[in-house]
Amino acid sequence: MADTPEITLYGAAWCGASRRVRLLLDSHSIPYRYIDIDADDEGARAVAVINHGNRSVPTLVWADGSTLVEPTNEALAKKLKISL
């Protein structure tokens, strides 16, 4: 579906790393769906499944099923094929 972002970002309002990832995505105009795991029980369960029981954020999930968990800016830029 063309209107559906390829990336789902699971994060939390209190998480500085989640804010950092959102800023990087926003600054490069990369569309994503944001789910706050403290406000969305289904999102919290998804993160726990992806991370083997841990509520690790930020967790990014691509449409192809690939994931990045708590990535550095450099690791995220490499995955996105962008320059910092």
Label the model's feature ranges.
Residues N51-V61:
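Structural micro-motif
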Residues M1-P31:
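Local sequence-structure signature of Cys/Sec-based thiol-disulfide redox active-site neighborhoods
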Residues A2-D3, R45-A48:
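Short secondary-structure transition/capping segments
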Residues V47-N51, K79-I82:
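Short amphipathic alpha-helix with an adjacent loop that forms part of the alpha/beta core around
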